[in-house]
């Protein structure tokens, strides 16, 4: 083992890991791995980016499953002996289990999943969005890049970003530029796909450290959340001017953001039981208090009828807020209070979201008229290890999702898309 550990510390495995460990924040240690051959290697190869509890609480895999999962993060092809010992340790101590199995609900809708595996290992591909030409853009947060897929050919291209940008999301403007949030360097950036030129817009306040989720309004103004900074931002692309406003509630942690039909912004609070309505010109904030203590909201979406749908991540529910009447109604997610609903999208009156606390991550369909749920396990290559952190519809009514742990971008096509019920 001493020889193997020395090989890890000085050799190819460390070289494979270096770009990602250097850019990822070191997680706080938690839990302890069982003793056995390969423990030191797992500690070195895995816990540079992941908390130990992520391994301890995993759904477990066969030897082949662990090999596939680790291959999405580090390249061990030049070190087969070390690769074998790594996967053997993980398979021995963390075999398949059903500790976090979702409660899958049957129904009449069928869905097809189409997957793309992004090129750079360990990038945590996320937040895919469709461009006007049908291409798909994504953020490779941990590898400091954004990428493009041509769904017709499968060809992919990745664009390196300025140092330590660590993009949290991507959005597109009407001119075809790709905008990203620099979550670790306090910037918003714009990529011109035709030239490859990147323009950075730095936050005017040093306290504004982490641009998070972004959305354009109908006037072409970019609005964005800053979760840990507890702020909302507005950027005028024509002038580069940025205005910031602090949330009314301390540690509200603004997360998801959407625009309603009247041009108002709506923000989800990931640290408090609230939704926030924002005036686009004044940035005046109006809080909507949600009734259940312990409620936290990762994301929200707005239906065509103006209803605000949100995930109650902290309580394992989805909810609906009527802005005209103030009525709030919530439904428990099928897998229960620990299911942690995360991303959400409303398409043709149907609510789609995921249960990120389960393994496999479950894609859930909810019909507000019948109040019935249906759900599916989300594929992630040959394993079920990822979670969706954001979902957005295509122009045809499909869903674009991802599995960040395995670098998968996925397009979901419901069979009865044309007749939604």
Regions found by a protein language model. Name each.
Residues 75-102, 134, 397-399:
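C-terminal capping alpha-helices of c-type cytochrome domains
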Residues 42-52, 86, 90:
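The canonical Cys-X-X-Cys-His
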Residues 137-142, 178-184, 222-228, 265-271, ...:
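Conserved beta-strand positions in repeat-built beta-propeller and related beta-rich domains
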Residues 121-133, 163-175, 206-219, 250-264, ...:
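Beta-rich, blade/repeat-based domains predominating
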Residues 385-421:
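Blade-level signature of beta-propeller repeat domains, shared across WD40, Kelch, NHL, RCC1
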Residues 104-122:
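A short helix->beta-strand "capping" segment at the edge of beta-propeller domains
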Residues 150-154, 192-196, 236-240, 279-283, ...:
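Short loop/turn segments that connect beta-strands within beta-propeller blades
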Residues 22-41:
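Electrostatic cytochrome c docking/interface patches
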């Amino acid at each position: 083992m001493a020889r193997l550990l020395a090989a890890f510390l000085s050799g190819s495995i460390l070289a494979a890991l270096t770009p990602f460990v250097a850019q990822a924040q070191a997680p706080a240690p938690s839990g302890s791995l069982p003793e056995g051959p390969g423990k030191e290697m797992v500690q070195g190869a895995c816990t540079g980016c992941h908390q130990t509890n992520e391994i301890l609480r995993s759904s477990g895999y066969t030897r082949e499953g662990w090999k596939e999962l680790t291959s999405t993060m580090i390249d061990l092809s030049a070190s087969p002996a070390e690769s074998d010992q790594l996967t053997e340790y993980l398979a021995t101590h963390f075999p398949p289990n059903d500790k976090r199995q979702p409660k899958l609900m049957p129904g009449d809708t069928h869905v097809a999943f189409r997957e793309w595996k992004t090129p750079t290992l360990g990038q945590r591909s996320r937040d895919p969005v469709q461009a006007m030409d049908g291409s798909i853009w994504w953020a490779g947060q941990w590898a400091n890049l954004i990428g493009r897929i041509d769904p017709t050919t499968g060809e992919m291209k990745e664009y390196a970003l300025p140092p330590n940008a660590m993009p949290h999301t991507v959005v597109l403007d009407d001119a075809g530029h790709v905008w990203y949030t620099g979550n670790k360097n306090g910037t918003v950036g714009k990529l011109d796909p035709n030239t490859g030129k990147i323009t950075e817009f730095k936050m005017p306040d040093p306290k504004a450290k982490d641009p998070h989720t972004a959305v354009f309004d109908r006037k072409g103004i970019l609005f964005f959340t800053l979760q840990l900074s507890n702020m909302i931002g507005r950027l005028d692309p024509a002038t580069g001017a940025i205005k910031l406003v602090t949330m009314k509630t301390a540690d509200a942690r603004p997360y998801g953001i959407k625009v309603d039909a009247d041009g108002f912004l709506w923000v989800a609070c990931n640290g408090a039981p609230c939704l926030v309505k924002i005036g686009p010109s004044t940035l005046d904030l109006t809080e909507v208090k949600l009734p259940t203590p312990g409620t936290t909201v990762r994301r929200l979406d707005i239906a065509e009828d103006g209803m605000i749908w949100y995930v109650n991540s902290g309580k394992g529910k989805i909810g609906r807020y009527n802005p005209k009447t103030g009525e709030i109604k919530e439904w428990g997610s099928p897998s229960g209070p620990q299911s942690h609903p995360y991303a959400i999208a409303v398409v043709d009156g149907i609510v789609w979201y995921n249960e990120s606390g389960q393994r496999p991550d479950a894609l859930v369909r909810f019909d507000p008229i019948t109040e019935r749920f249906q759900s599916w396990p989300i594929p992630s290559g040959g394993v079920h290890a990822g979670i969706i952190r954001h979902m957005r519809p295509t122009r045809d009514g499909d869903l674009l999702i991802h599995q960040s742990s395995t670098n998968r971008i996925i397009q979901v096509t419901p069979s009865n898309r044309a007749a939604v019920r």
